[in-house]
Amino acid sequence: MTATAPTDGSTDTGLLRPHAEQLYAAELAELAGADDRPRPPSWRLSPWAVLTYLLGGELASGFTVSPKYVGPRRLVEVAVATLATDRALLLLGVPGTGKTWLSEHLAAAISGDSTLVVQGTSGTAEEAIRYGWNYARLLAEGPSPAALVQSPVLTAMRDGKVARVEELTRIPSDVQDSLIAILSEKALPVPELGTEVQAVRGFNVVATANNRDRGVNELSSALRRRFNTVVLPLPASPEEELAIVTRRVADLGVALRLPELPPALDEIRRVVTVFRELREGMTADGRTKLKSPSGTMSTAEAISVVTNGIVLAAHFGDGVLRPSDVAAGIVGTVVQDPVSDVACWTEYLEAVARERPGWADFYRACREISR
């Protein structure tokens, strides 16, 4: 795993977490130059080019576009096609399935701007979706366009861009419903100014929500009807998940300037195997049923465990990723509940890890951490 320079079409910006349109500016520029297909109004790229940007491919010039999302092609096609209509898009899935990652790259490819984001929380107010006021100017001048503070959604409406609403089901239900008029009428009344803002062609909304959040602030049927829903699955196979983890770890290594380590595919494969077996409640060979922990054991968490292990190996180890470097991260991810998860993890260690050939070092490292 190298951390010296980008190995794909990404651009080194020097930023800790550059936006997608900054990091992949070179790829977006190459795609725009090679794209001669019809583009929907206000789109930077055609749907074909957006799909190529997301899934990767080789252009006629020989330029290679790196894949941003690994998953069923048809789901991505449906997502892109939805945004070419007047229907909003809801990306639904368990934590760690890449919903936010995909929404960011969709906005970057379509609008060249992934920053028009409403981050949903239990404290999100209606102003975050509609508009607010600069109260100093409001008191001094009264309601005026200059005193109006645009929300990301309002900015997207005026500019014909894609707005993102993250964690939609965490937003209070009455605030969620402020989206209904925007999505159905494509207009936002501003009664204080006696006017309304009508959306420019190209405006749309991508929202994300976790399956496990359903019931916290359930979407109203009226709001749900305004969305086309695409359910993002967990990686279908161990090899697919391994490819995702390996690639994202390499990308993070470049972004964080982590020290260069020798390839550690076997150790990453072991982390992926542990996560998949605990998540699915069954060993990979189908012979042993397991208790699943209370956590999600997501791909995103596996990426975090491996990345943290690389830092431990580089700064406090011998420069090689070993079981002892990932053990603490795995235990911390599995054991969320001090009672049920401890029993689940102990069962896995004794029934699976202890008996599996080649896992003795991993078993000892995890037992040491679990004491």
For the regions a language model picked out, list residue spans one by one:
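A general alpha-helix detector
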Residues: 226, 244, 308-312, 329
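Exposed alpha-helical structural elements
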Residues: 49-50, 152, 240, 244, ...
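C-terminal engagement/docking regions of AAA+ P-loop ATPases
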Residues: 314-371
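A diffuse structural propensity rather than consistent per-protein peaks
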Residues: 46, 125, 149, 164, ...
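Short alpha-helical scaffolding segments that buttress acidic/His motifs in well-ordered protein cores
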Residues: 79, 271, 275, 329-330
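AAA+ P-loop NTPase catalytic core and its hallmark functional loops
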Residues: 2-257
